[in-house]
Amino acid sequence: MEKDKRLVFDTIPEKFDKWRVRYDPKLFDYIIKTTGLGPGRSCLEIGPGTGQASDFAINSGADYLAIELGSHLADKMREKYSSYPNFHIVNADFETYDFGGKKFDLIYSAATIQWIKEDIAYSRVHDLLKDGGYLAMCLMRSEYKSENPELYEEIQKVYDECFDTNQPYDQHFDYMNGGKYGLTFIEEKSFHGRREYTADEHTEYMGTHSTHIALKEEAREPFFNGVRDAIIRHGNKVVYNDEYVVYLYKKG
């Protein structure tokens, strides 16, 4: 039986929690201001991981429910947030879970919803939203080429020569297709940030990417060492420019 690709991050809960990138707080401020999330409102987070995009919703005072497929990730969420009275989580599959008629003012995800088949994702979200409720889909785009083109070329050469994964990323999800499923597109909003890593830090960060977690064993050492050595040759620093994006829809 083929292993569920959606569980790839569940194999590294502690590393995922430490090294996965957090979003710009301004993005979450925008979501709260636009959707009115707060006490008396309800929200559902699809696939929270270990809480990279959970604090703002929990701290808003809204009734927060997360649905997480990975049991180890769900355990990490409970460890971090179970002391909050408005925090709830189910370890289940969003595609099939019975929410018992519950409806939400906000449903959101951070780089998670694209792991669900598009028709299922949008249709279920539409059914689970209250009239006037919102869908917020967050993602991050990053690049390091502009800061150091020579380093970028060296790292790409390592990818070309050494990268061999058991799980290529082949998800197909269009963030602009919500209108086909009865949702009204509001806007796409972007925020920007910057981060730096040493060679060793970057190795840890890369190890949280789905395709890198699933690297073939014989490729792991030459690939990670090759990227690490390239960064060391360029001052032991790699700089990423990040774009934090949210696609916002409304029901009704």
Please tell me what each predicted stretch does:
Residues 44, 50-97:
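Class I SAM-dependent methyltransferase SAM/SAH-binding core
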Residues 97-107:
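A short acidic, Gly/Pro-enriched loop at the edge of an enzyme's catalytic core
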Residues 126, 130-195:
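Conserved catalytic/acceptor-binding region of the Class I
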Residues 115-125:
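A short, conserved alpha-helix within the catalytic core of class I
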Residues 111-112, 139:
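Short catalytic micro-motifs in class I SAM-dependent methyltransferases
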Residues 1-38:
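Conserved class I S-adenosyl-L-methionine
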Residues 50, 167, 172-252:
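Conserved Class I S-adenosyl-L-methionine
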